[in-house]
A protein has these predicted regions:
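Perimembrane helix-loop-helix junctions
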Residues: 145, 151, 177-212, 217, ...
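Extracytoplasmic catalytic/substrate-binding loops of multi-pass membrane glycan-assembly enzymes
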Residues: 28-46, 55-71, 77-78, 223-224, ...
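Transmembrane-helix signature of polytopic, membrane-embedded enzymes
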Residues: 98-121
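Short acidic/glycine- and proline-prone juxtamembrane loop motifs at membrane-interface regions
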Residues: 127-136
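Membrane-interface transmembrane helices that cradle and orient dolichyl/undecaprenyl
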Residues: 103-106, 142-158, 195
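Membrane-interface alpha helices of multi-pass inner-membrane proteins
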Residues: 123, 145, 157-175, 179-184, ...
Length: 262
């Protein structure tokens, strides 16, 4: 009987944690494959020369550059494979963390795990591109916190979710679109006939503003009041000389080959 109980405990432990371990390590499968001379190298160059890089691009993806510069100071952070490992582990931690949270709250954990594996398999950009991935990590965290806030009526979590989404704007300005996550709050309030929806909205907005002010405050303190507006103006001005930065060009770049060769 004792042997069976011990075997059941071991089986339960493996059943619980092996899927988590796979999600954690799966992004490492290609860390030693090839050399990327495009976005991967561009991002690593920004981290390595963060203190002397062009201010426009430093501020355009500020929090991503700060995190990348910090990772590059870790052991082997001055090597390509070392940075691949560190940044890929961030992806794995995010996926494993999301799975651990969702399997406790949703049915069919196997389907959740398969969905996480599919999402990891579709990550096309190099993991060192933190200006993309850090925004994804923050959005994932915000969604999980917001889900907890909605299902448990936790006002603090509304604020925390807002803070996380505000920080995401410091990663890259287009992440301001993540503010659309207020729509599920309103939809859930409509479904549950929640009369406190307006207060919850204010909690979210307050947290969002607070999260937004943190990176902006650091930028203003270090680079001056005009630094961020000048960066925005410079980025918008690039569409005059670099047509591939226009929104229409970016959209056509995604679908151009399909249209051309279909």
């Amino acid at each position: 009987m004792d042997m069976n109980m011990k075997q059941n405990k071991i089986y339960g432990f493996l059943q619980k944690w092996i899927p988590v371990l796979i999600l954690l390590l799966y992004p490492l499968r290609k860390v030693n494959t090839g050399i990327d001379l495009m976005d991967g190298g561009y991002s690593l160059g920004n981290y390595r020369f963060f203190t002397t890089m062009n201010q426009v691009w430093k501020l355009a993806t500020y929090l991503a550059n700060v995190l990348g510069a910090a990772l590059s100071r870790l052991p082997f952070g001055n090597t390509w494979i070392g940075m691949n490992v560190y940044t890929a582990l961030l992806t794995g931690i995010t996926a494993a963390g999301a799975y651990c949270v969702l399997r406790k709250r949703l049915q069919h954990p196997v389907l959740i795990w398969l969905g996480e594996m599919l999402a990891l398999s579709l990550c096309w950009a190099p993991p060192t591109n933190l200006y993309q991935y850090l925004g994804y990590y923050l959005m994932t965290a915000a969604v999980l916190v917001l889900y907890h806030a909605l299902t448990n009526k936790n006002n603090i979590c509304y604020i925390i979710a807002g803070i996380i989404l505000g920080l995401a704007v410091g990663v890259r300005m287009p992440n301001i679109t993540y503010a659309a996550l207020i729509l599920p709050v309103w939809y859930y309030a409509w479904l549950t006939k929640d009369r406190d929806w307006f207060i919850h909205t204010l909690y979210c907005i307050g947290g969002y503003v607070l999260g937004l002010l943190v990176p902006l405050g650091v930028i203003v303190f270090k680079y001056g009041v005009q630094a961020y507006p000048e960066m925005i103006a410079s980025l918008f001005g690039m569409t005059d000389t670099a047509t591939d930065y226009k929104p229409t060009s970016m959209i056509m770049a995604m679908f151009g080959d399909y249209i051309q060769y279909s």
